[in-house]
Amino acid sequence: MNHPYLDPSFLVSWSRLTPEAIRPDITEAISRAKENIRTICDQPLESLTYESTFGALEKASEDLHLGWGRIMHLDSVNDEPAQREAIGEMLPEVVTFSSSVPLNPRLWTVLKAAASCDWVEDLSPVRQRFIQETLADFRESGADLPDDVKPEYAEIEAQLSLKTKKFAENVLDSTNAWELIVEDEAELSGLPDSAKEAARLDALANGHGTEEAPRWRFTQKFTSLQPVMQFADSDSLRRRMWEGSCSIGKGGEYDNEALIAEILELRDRKAHLLGYGCFADYATSRRMAGSGANALKFINDLHDKVKPSFLKDMEAVRRYKEEKTGKSVEKLSPWETGYWSEKRRRELYAFDEEDLRPYYSVEKVMEGLFSIYSGLYGITVTPRPTVAFKPGESGEAPEGAVEVWHPDVLFYELHDAESGEHLGSFYADWHPRDSKRAGAWMNCLSVGEPPHGGKPRAPHLGLMVGNMTKPVGDKPALLSHREVETIFHEFG
């Protein structure tokens, strides 16, 4: 049987990754992983090697990681009902298998025996470190728990996966369900023209207004929310947008309040089962903070250091509003701080950040980014033409074109400038849409390897995703300075 999610080809045929293929592909991947784990467990303890234990464990679930990784990526950038349903059906099975690996007593015995072998001292520092981290991962995942406690731990892991997934779905769905339609253009005073035009076109696309009688649609997506909170003169408009942002995942069909309480309780139970005082201690135990108390101390210390400057700035903004309105201002409301801070900044420094946008088209920003990194690291970054098909849709890509999951997505190849060797490639998906979760992130789809053992280099395949200003009509996407910083951050 053909398994598109498990296809190891470097370039992904995204249109073949349909919701219908999720169950058979992940079922097959779990079956392969179970057989690989069984092989590790069945070997005699007297003849263990690195390759037959830790090396084999690293590769045991490769197909599952590949397939599920692609599925989770599509869940983040292209959430749709049939796909969500298929993921919901398979998530418990994936979690059950993943939890069972560190809870497998025979596998744990084999790994501990291998870690105590004399040959470990002759391994490279990288492999020794991998052994240490793997053992720590297993202990952190319940390997040392008594057998009668392991089922409870596995059930907690399963419930956490389901509830955190539902939490994220509620955030996306409640964000998409919220809209504010403005009928009076006077309410939009102060908004940049680009934000007004984007809101007008969004309203048209969603059935509000006409060319002759326009309406303006605002949502809780950052590119719609942020300009209003920073520039809109209407206090009422800013307040409604702020109240909307506070309503995401709160009340109604997409309420997350009960889920949050359940997730916190499950995390606390998990931490106590593993011998930690609280979940914060568990989460920080292998990080620089070392404990929840240390992390909280750091946060409180930082808070105490910055609070005086913050209060000083807010007092200056309060006085500024008082001066400009001629009215007594006891304190600033949350929907006022960004607006009045921006007006004060413009007056103090005679600088409007919006004036930078014409210089920050996505194309120019990417060109500048690549120029900097080419000089730093001796690489070249080259765009490739792209083509997008709908899931299940067959089509022939133009020669040299790379298939992507959405028409907005770009694709680049990265080569060594001197040798021309292909080091890796990456996708870039910069603009918001209803099927895409909020925020910005980078991730890998397949991890490359340097040349070794006579094998050539395996290039890396990664991705960068954001939710930045969209093109307006036939005009290019012009970014804010903060959005430019985000692109540099994700690429770095």
How does the language model describe each region?
Residues 278, 369, 464, 480-492:
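Extended, hydrophobic alpha-helical segments in both membrane/secreted and soluble proteins
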Residues 35-39, 43, 47-50, 54-97, ...:
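Active-site-adjacent, His/Asp/Glu-enriched structural segments that form or flank metal-binding
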Residues 361, 468-488:
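Short pre-active-site segment immediately N-terminal to the catalytic Zn-binding motif
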Residues 1-28, 32-35, 76-290, 305, ...:
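His/Asp/Glu-rich acidic catalytic environments and adjacent acidic regulatory segments
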Residues 126, 130, 159-165, 169-219, ...:
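Active-site-proximal, well-structured secondary-structure segments within enzyme catalytic domains
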Residues 79, 119-123, 134-138, 252, ...:
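Aromatic/His-enriched, Gly/Pro-containing loop or helix-boundary segments
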Residues 14-26, 49-54, 252-257, 295-299, ...:
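Membrane-entry segments of alpha-helical transmembrane domains in multi-pass membrane proteins
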Residues 230, 237, 252, 354-361, ...:
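Short histidine-centered catalytic/ligand-binding loop motif
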